[in-house]
């Protein structure tokens, strides 16, 4: 089993070949572009473990940007008792879907 942990946008994600990664919106890339993650923190390949200090040298993860979209709406309610007042707000966060094509060592 081959998987890696990559760091992007201040977060770490576990990725495997062929899977789809949902991450914060990557503004610099358009759908169809190739994206390369060179900040690989950890790699596991057939029982062999590589841990970076802080990153694994020579390792990179290559993916393809599928789409930019918005996530489901998160609703918040602020209610003030005895004031006959409440405020409802909603927020939809942008994300980028990336198909992981290969993990290179």
Curated annotation (Swiss-Prot):
GO-annotated biological processes: translation
Keyword list, A-Z: Ribonucleoprotein, Ribosomal protein, RNA-binding, rRNA-binding
Listed InterPro entries: bL21-like, bL21-like_sf, Ribosomal_bL21, Ribosomal_bL21_CS
GO cellular component, as recorded: cytoplasm; ribonucleoprotein complex; ribosome
Keyword RNA-binding: yes
Sample GO molecular function, one term: rRNA binding
Protein origin, superkingdom: Bacteria
Description of how the protein assembles with itself and partners: Part of the 50S ribosomal subunit. Contacts protein L20.
PANTHER family recorded: 50S RIBOSOMAL PROTEIN L21, LARGE RIBOSOMAL SUBUNIT PROTEIN BL21M
Family designation: Belongs to the bacterial ribosomal protein bL21 family.
Function summary: This protein binds to 23S rRNA in the presence of protein L20.
Name of protein: Large ribosomal subunit protein bL21
UniProt organism field: Thermotoga maritima (strain ATCC 43589 / DSM 3109 / JCM 10099 / NBRC 100826 / MSB8)
Record lineage: Bacteria, Thermotogati, Thermotogota, Thermotogae, Thermotogales
Gene: rplU
């Amino acid at each position: 089993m081959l998987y890696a942990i990559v760091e992007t946008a201040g977060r770490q994600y576990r990725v495997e070949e062929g899977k789809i990664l949902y991450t914060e919106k990557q503004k610099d890339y358009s759908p169809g572009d190739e994206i390369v993650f060179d900040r690989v923190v950890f790699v596991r390949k057939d029982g062999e473990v590589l841990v970076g200090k802080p990153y694994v040298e020579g390792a990179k993860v290559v993916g393809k940007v599928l789409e930019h979209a918005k996530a489901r709406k998160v609703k918040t309610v602020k209610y003030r008792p005895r004031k006959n007042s409440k405020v409802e707000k909603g927020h939809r966060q942008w994300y980028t879907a990336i198909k992981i094509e290969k993990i290179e060592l």
